[in-house]
Amino acid sequence: MRSSRFVASRVEQGIIAAVLAGCVTMAANAQTVTNNGTGTNSGYFYSLFTSSGKATMTFPEDAQYPGNYAISWSGVGDMVGGKGWSTGGNMSVGYNVGSASGYNTISVYGWTTNPLVEYYITEIGSLYTANAAFKGSVSSDGHTYNTYEHSQVNQPSIEGTATFEQYLDAWGGASIGSNHTVTTGNHFSHWQSLGMNLGSFNYMILATEAYNGASGEVNATVW
């Protein structure tokens, strides 16, 4: 009996250790980002910016789909968040937006430095382009995108408040719930041909943006 009790104790200890290890792993994977932050999750870079209001980012399906993210927001002045890569560049970006509401745009979005440039390749929704200069159009991945350039003066950036250019390729016709591809090099080459120069690539993400007091949510995956 002593031996049996000892063995049972060892088994119980093993079960307890396994449960605790599982809890630690679950806690490590259950990341939550509120309002503002950058970091990594399941090998992907994430970024969340909120000027006002409230936004929360989680990664509910990252165990199966490492590029998955979800954001919920309410009353935001401007919210931009998503998942992708810490360094952008010429890539074939795949994505699927499983569900979305209350957003303005969903885009491949990123920054370069020297020069400081903020860029959008908009897949879903409509960019606000009233004050932007129309530069032409480009065909890529079976779609036609209209190209715009806009100067941002004393606005938030990855380098703090700054003056910089925005490059915008707007399509907006992608469907929710389907797989899509963005060949970023086609857009970058097109911009360069127009004299819209890019610098060194900073992060590049599949970004959801909402503004003007919007409330909503999104669940999307990038790869």
Indicate residue ranges for each PLM-predicted region:
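Bacterial N-terminal signal peptides that target proteins for export
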Residues: 2-16
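Cleavable N-terminal signal peptides
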Residues: 15-18, 28
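Short, flexible beta-strand-to-coil junctions
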Residues: 23-24, 96-102, 111-114, 174, ...
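Sec/Tat signal peptide C-region and signal peptidase I cleavage site
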Residues: 24-30
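N-terminal segment immediately downstream of the Sec signal-peptide cleavage site
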Residues: 31-82, 223
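Extracellular-facing segments of soluble proteins and assemblies that are Gly/Ser/Thr-biased and enriched
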Residues: 78-140
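An exposed acidic His-Trp-rich patch
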Residues: 114-177
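Long, compositionally biased interface segments
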Residues: 178-223
